[in-house]
Amino acid sequence: TVKADTYLINPAGDWTLGGLDADSGLSGRKLVVDAYGPNVPIGGGSFSGKDYTKVDRSGAYMARKIAVDLLKYHHSQEVMVKLAYAIGIAEPVMALAIIDGEGHDLLSSNYLDYDLSPQGIRLALGLDNYHFVDFSTWGHFGRHDLSASWC
């Protein structure tokens, strides 16, 4: 039995679209490589083949930005940020930062001054200004040659 405060069952309504018209992405390849290798857990959604309105891609970029910001702020050795979204819900259902092994609930604290909705992420990271084909070759993170706001 799964116990939770809230159960979200098809919060966006009927799921009638599929393929390239929906949230499927093109290939789904290189998931682990695109997300730091095997050291960082991934949700299974690919970046390439999806536009940045999909939180598989933009949420990962925002998690990276938040992790780097918290790393600098706390002068930490390691920060991992986990964001979880439900289809049809604009805000994340979970936002957790693990800072040097200690967990912090980012939704119930004053750690964040970020809008974590897809629209908020788009604006905060300036995602309208990038040509994402540039990221498909050498990765999505740590690309100082592309001056991405989340790198």
Q: Where are these predicted regions, by residue range?
A:
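Internal helix-turn-beta structural module
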Residues: Y73, E78-C151
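Generic structural signal for short, flexible, solvent-exposed coil/loop and linker residues
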Residues: A4-T6, W15, L20-A22, Y36, ...
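Short, ordered loop/turn segments at secondary-structure junctions
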Residues: A12, P38, Y52, L83-A86, ...
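Glycine-rich, mobile lid/loop segments that gate access to catalytic sites or pores
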Residues: T1-G18, G120-I121, T137, G142, ...
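Conserved mixed alpha/beta catalytic, RNA-binding, or beta-rich assembly cores of soluble enzyme
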Residues: T1, W15-G19, S24-E78
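Structured core elements
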Residues: T6-I9, T16, G25, V32-D34, ...
